From Swiss-Prot:
This is NAD(P)H-quinone oxidoreductase subunit L. It is a multi-pass membrane protein. NDH-1 shuttles electrons from an unknown electron donor, via FMN and iron-sulfur (Fe-S) centers, to quinones in the respiratory and/or the photosynthetic chain. The immediate electron acceptor for the enzyme in this species is believed to be plastoquinone. Couples the redox reaction to proton translocation, and thus conserves the redox energy in a proton gradient. Cyanobacterial NDH-1 also plays a role in inorganic carbon-concentration. Belongs to the complex I NdhL subunit family.
């Protein structure tokens, strides 16, 4: 029973908790990241890809519309 609970906690962290943190990190740092930090971002997306796929229908992090001054 303990092992099943441990697997459930690890699966929840891998598929939900950490990918949510990765999405917010990418949203905050995407346009200002250095090259090493961008490499870390690519690794995180590669490593947590299944969780990001699970969350992708619900996440909407498109850039905000620009305000054009006339």
């Amino acid at each position: 029973m303990i092992v099943a609970l441990l697997y459930l906690i690890l699966a929840g962290a891998y598929l939900l908790v950490i990918p949510i943190a990765v999405l917010f990190y990418l949203k905050q740092r995407w346009y200002v990241a250095s090259s090493i930090e961008r490499l870390l971002m690519y690794f995180l997306v590669f490593f947590f890809f299944p969780g990001l796929l699970v969350l992708s229908p619900f996440a909407n992090f498109r850039p905000q519309r620009r305000q054009v001054q006339v």
